[in-house]
Amino acid sequence: MCTSLLVGKNATVDGSVICTQSSDCGNCDIRLEYVPAAVYQPGEMRVVKGWNVYDFLGTKGSPPVRSGPTITIPQVKQTYAYMATTFPFMNEHQVAIGEATLVGIRTELAPSENSDAKIRITDLSRIALERATTAREAINIMASLMEEHGFNAWNPNWMNLVPGGNDACGEYFAVADKDEVWCFEFLPVGSDWKKDSGEPGVCWCAMRIPDDMFAVNANESIIGEINLSDKDNFMASSNVKSLAIKHGWWDPKSGEPFRWDLAYTGKKANSLRTWRALSMVTPSQNLQPHADGYPMPIRPDKKLSILDIRKIHGDRLEGTEFDQTKGLAAGPFGSPNWPFGAPDQTRAIGTMSSDTIIINQCREWLPALIGGVMWVGLGGGDINLYVPFYAGITRLPKAYTTGVRTQFDWDSAFWVFELVGSWAQLNYVNMIKEIKAEQLRIESAELDRQAAIDEEAWKLYQEDPYLAREHLTNYCIENANEAVDSWRALANSLIAHYSFGTATTIEKFIAPEWWRKEISEKRK
């Protein structure tokens, strides 16, 4: 259950376009993958696999791959390099994608084994980044493939995403490039779709986020009214309205405008995560939780930075009535990671189930291989550390390509960050202060260096783009390795300092009085 943010270039402090994704599955792949560019011969085919959310490398000891249907499509002459985890996130032309599953769509749209629909999202988005040089092109590539071969959505019950929920879900991609960012939502078209029916195998709609606006997707549709005559800001499939009319979800004679969200989900986006993200960027609006929808996209009160975005992705509802660090479930030391099954448990943007969080930064004033930056955080947004990887790099640090979910590995970057996060649960209220201080120190230094790294890369690029790639690759590897070493040192310090509630100074961390009193009363 992911969260994705979209920010137009005039809503950021430096003119960057930003789109993000938190992979919150808790069992997705924890490694990064660099997929190089390639050239193909006429007549070659591209296998489209039915991967879901599991290990794409098939390393021994990994979770099993859950595959779906496989098809082949004609390969293109040239594919572009890109970076990925379970999902891809940016290519060498700084086309970027962030994903979130749409839950709660109409049950009649769920596909079945009788359907001819074959396309699933992991390889779909990879194909887009292999072939696209702009966001619009990426959307059209994906839409065309699904219209021809059908969108085969996975079942949220099968994935245990929504206990007691329905069997239908759709998908959302934030799709960005150096100039703009789009919200692209698409749905399956039912259990009986056939390829030879003459009907598209998907129902989709895309909305451009205005340059001075911000939006968030928290697993619910955020597209409302659409204006298909405004081709600069909207795109859609030919069945975008007819499918709703067919099922009785919208009547054009009613006088009511067509709303994508109401037609296909029956509601406007109003989750706690949606409210929290919007309220963090527009405190002046005084938005209230659980309203009947929110203005989306929205103009932020101030221009946003990378650090602002990382704060949103790490938010645990602190300072609100839903604060996860408060109350009996948080324990005496304020852990936001409540036990499963705790009453009144809320879902914050930050969560311990995050495998990776990617902040894609696209900048039009630089060549693509320099302008595109992927800020990668492994583990929960409150306890991880973001490191930059440029779009033009050709290699990755070993620590970021190592590790599986089923075995602790001190050489795996994910497990270093996960160890710090897990240990922090012993005394969160105190340890999180030390973690945040290290986050700010390292990430601020990375951002301070960015202009100098860009400038040197630009000088080398004018001489030979290969030299710029090597410069950026070496910097990213060195910086990432230093970051992991810093987090290993932090882990060593926290383990020694917070051992069974007693510090090496013999300072004891006593549970707060309110907690001791409440526990005492419950024992009576």
Regions found by a protein language model. Give the residues of each.
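Accessory, solvent-exposed terminal regions and/or long lumenal/extracellular loops of proteins
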Residues: 265, 274, 279-343, 347-351, ...
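Histidine-centered catalytic/metal-binding microenvironments
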Residues: 443-524
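Substrate-recognition/cap regions that form aromatic- and gly/pro-loop-enriched pockets
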Residues: 333-462
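A short catalytic or substrate-binding loop motif that flags glycine-/basic-rich loops and adjacent residues
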Residues: 1, 165-167, 349-355
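A contiguous strand-loop segment
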Residues: 2-121, 141-303
